[in-house]
Amino acid sequence: MTAIQHFFKTFFLTELLKGLALTGRYTFKRKFTVQFPEEKTPISPRFRGLHALRRYENGEERCIACKLCEAVCPALAITIESETRADNTRRTTRYDIDLTKCIFCGFCEESCPVDSIVETQILEYHGEKRGDLYFTKEMLLAVGDRYEKDIAAAKAADAPYR
């Protein structure tokens, strides 16, 4: 760019006028606003929300304590302790997720070989205190039990893409 071109761009404020033209173009377009608590937008089938632990049909928890989800978690939000049962299978004694650390990346769900840990489509949850967002095994199993039909339907719909 020559010095003369630079002078004219600076003197006539062409960059500023381009920005104002862009702003003016969107000023008169129809606005899209959602009044959130009353109105809701559709959620993607692959939305990653609140975690849940699933059970088999016979009521036994699916988690085999392989600890892959704990190893793959980039935020170190998952803590697992396990013990070996009499039939030489492992089961978790402690499975905790700290949602204040979790970045909802979905790696835990992808790494699970038995589809035990899943991320549901629940997005409306809160905590009054920091400790309210620390989910224990019992809390995660309760979420899984309550929303098992929705979780199974979402897994079935996503099966061709896995």
UniProtKB/Swiss-Prot annotation:
One of its GO terms (molecular function) is iron ion binding. It is found in: Cell inner membrane. Signal peptide: none annotated. HAMAP family: NDH1_NuoI. This is NADH-quinone oxidoreductase subunit I. It holds the Pfam family Fer4_7. It comes from Burkholderia cenocepacia (strain HI2424). NDH-1 shuttles electrons from NADH, via FMN and iron-sulfur (Fe-S) centers, to quinones in the respiratory chain. The immediate electron acceptor for the enzyme in this species is believed to be ubiquinone. Couples the redox reaction to proton translocation (for every two electrons transferred, four hydrogen ions are translocated across the cytoplasmic membrane), and thus conserves the redox energy in a proton gradient. Its main location: membrane.
